Amino acid sequence: MSLSIRITDVHGREILDSRGNPTVEVEVTAQTEPTGRKTVGRESVPSGASTGRFEAIELRDGEERFFGLGVSRVVDHINKRIRQELVGMNVLDQVKIDRKLVELDGTDNKGNLGANALLGVSLACARCASNALDMPLYRYLGGMNAKKWPMPMMNVINGGAHAKNNLDFQEFMIVPVGAASFPDALRMGAEIYHYLRLILHEEGRLTAVGDEGGFAPEFSNAKEVFACLQRAVEKAGYQMGSDIAFAMDAAASELYNSEDGMYHFPGESRANQSVEQNLARPDTEGNGEVIRSAQEMISLYEELALEYPLISIEDGLDEDDWDGWQELTNRLNEKMMLVGDDLFVTNVKRIRCGIDLHVANSVLIKVNQIGTLTEAMDAIELAQKNGYKAVISHRSGETEDAFIADLAVAVNAGWIKTGAPCRGERTAKYNQLLRLSEGLDA
């Protein structure tokens, strides 16, 4: 006889994320039959700053309160319509629950009830089920095959939409590839992070942090950042390449201008002008603006990879530039991870298109891009079955929730992005991975 743990209540509320903006928290209560034992699962929903055009829709109120960012309408959907449909369902039937949520919304982009409504409920159901079974979440999601700790890609220098500086590329990460265990990896990253703070201070640069806990100082370009990171790595006593590698998120869609088909670098342009340099692409006005074509973007990445141990580039080109992505993949596929975030948006249809076109070799997984746990896990399965790496990722607007730490272990992702070893909403994930690593293979 199959176990029956029936949902008795679904309750949503408005809470604050790490940027002080409203987001959704959901509690699902279920009762085990015939014992009558009640269990609660609670989860919250993150929010991104630089979002892909093809992401599922995050609903906001658009009213005066919270500058239009309130989610009271989403909470209302959860507490009325969604609750009415889910009460009585078996909380163990995750696929059926998620199908019901998608059916209730009735749109391709979750624009009716909101991806933030669906995701909060979906994740809370999974948490409630694992609690009801007295089973760790990663084990409930991944079964006995969940046994691999993920390598952290730690965002220590922030730019782009995550910081107010001249850095056009969004994230610069250190990756402790030489670590023998997750505790070692986290220690190495934290040590380098603190040495980086000292170096920035000595150089007279700001050590204020951005949304993801990384520092947000002024640099003119990516090469300056990597040179500074190299100094921090060496000062911490580690070897470039064998101990520590680099990764970056270009977030190129944020730089792309659809009118001229070029990538515009306003921060680098300002930095060049401030030191009376003109390193720009020649243009008719000769105004010193830094503009790059897709080919020049790829050449820049090749230069960086020759000079530094760069093992991963995320969103190296625009989310619609499939031809450019094919060229990027042809030239760099054997040298590094080419990660699609805005390109794929955790969407099975777009991932399948990328596979068919031989575009990229890795997929960034953000559960709120698609709206339900089942759809996210389908995306991971499709990627891994076709030889693509899966990188589990946070968002820039996070909460103290650590669901993605368990998810990364559950699917043996091998890689996780959850910011710098700083700020409570980031360290919550790292600390959960420390706990999980005690029962995992090294």
Where are these regions (language model features)?
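Glycine/threonine-rich beta-strand-loop-alpha-helix active-site module
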Residues: 135-153
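Conserved phosphate/anionic-ligand binding catalytic regions in large, soluble enzymes, centered on
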Residues: 15-26, 109-130, 151-167, 211-215, ...
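Mobile "lid/hinge" segments at catalytic clefts and subdomain interfaces of large enzymes
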Residues: 147-210
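Short, Gly/Pro- and small/polar-rich lid/capping loops
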Residues: 1-23
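Metal- or metallocofactor-binding catalytic centers and their adjacent structured scaffolds
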Residues: 46-131, 135, 186, 214
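Short beta-strand elements
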Residues: 24-32, 43-47, 154-176, 248-267, ...
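Catalytic core of soluble alpha/beta enzymes
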Residues: 223-442
